[in-house]
Amino acid sequence: VEKPKNKSNFCIKPFNSAWIDATGEINACCFLDPLQSEYTEKKQYNIKETDIKTWWGSDYMKYLRSNFLKDKRPTECSECWKREDTGLISYRMRSNTEHRAIFKSKYQRNLKLIGKDDLQFPDDLQMNITNLCNLKCQMCSGEHSSKLLVENNALGYEDLNQKDFDLKDSDYVKILELLKHDLKILKILGGEPLFNPRVIKLLEMLVENGQAKKIKLHITTNGTICDDKIISLLKNFKDLRLVFSVDGVGKCNEYMRFPSRWEVISANITKFKENLVNAYIMVNCAVQNLNVLYLDELLEFTNQKKIFVKFELVIHPNWLHLSVLPKNVLSMAYEKLSSVKEKDLLHTDNVKEIIELLKQHIDNYNLDENKYKNFIDMINKRDTYRKIKLENYMPKLARAIAT
């Protein structure tokens, strides 16, 4: 069995991973949409109606794996193909790099069992346990933030019911029990995981039953919560990755991730870093039209802290896309990022990707007036609802779009 070529369309996720969201939907990853599949009997599996074993051994999953082994591009994976076709690094590419070590072990074993019912269970599980969150970030949705759900419903942007995001504790306990012998990586996302008593309870269970010593735990957090109990629990895991969702420094992040306080987040990052020797700590920044003028400040902060920062381009919602900005703002952002000193790029790997994308938008500039109007309307409506003003948080951006 040969290892897939680096430049192929192969993705490791259907061979080793499961993703479960707060509504109970289960897929190989968070970007995959099975309803967009060309498979004749496509369906969305849900742990409220089935179990992870049935989904993992389903004919659909065998079909998906088979497509990747034939070097095809499954239509349900369009989000990754879109990114790659525009020169961006996709989740597929990152996942293949992250799991390269298992290509010769679990990948080969599961390859031999394609079409059979005894595929080894996933060893990488990502769970969005609930949408319970203490912030309402600009790029988020009600599916991932209970606070933003309330705001979006009030503004008429969504029609979701909070009860749809309340899975039973027993559902997750059942899943972890089923994966007890295979699970190596557990990724917990939000809402805000550390704001959620259910997550703390889950971590306690993993520590008490001894699984924590065998698990690499990944938690994505907004950095607003840190206490001694959480630190004590996290110390028990074999390996730990804490990813802080930060979109700027100071007032910029407070606007992007409202109603956070920067001094609290900065202090918590330091506290986690100093008290968790088993942790790899990094920052994930959602690059969008609201914060692109301030990325150089974030680079300076992460460099001072000696923390790696990864930049992820926001595609949805489309009113936050970089292409919606006036040309003068794109040019300002390009000049600022291009002038960042090499010493401030020691702890990142994809700034040049963002710089190149800005240049492409400038060189092929074609502003959609309707999208720009929607961008301004969204800012004004959210600011009015939150009783804040953009110019008090990000004056450079406010002045730039005003001119």
Language-model features: where?
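Conserved C-terminal portion of the radical SAM core fold
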Residues: S17-T23, D239-V243, E263-A402
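Eukaryote-biased activation of long, low-complexity terminal tails and linkers
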Residues: E158-Y172, L179-L186, L202-E208, A212-K213, ...
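Core AdoMet radical
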Residues: P122-L132, E143-S170, H181-N196, N209-D227, ...
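A generic secondary-structure signal
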Residues: K174-L178, M205-N209, S232-L233, N268-N275, ...
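Distinct, well-ordered alpha-helical segments
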Residues: R198-E204, D228-L234, Y294-D296
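Glycine-rich, phosphate-binding/catalytic loops in enzymes
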Residues: Q36, L202-V207, L234-F237, P259-E263, ...
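N-terminal pre-core extensions flanking Radical SAM catalytic domains
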Residues: V1-D21, E25-F31, Q36-K163, L179-K180, ...
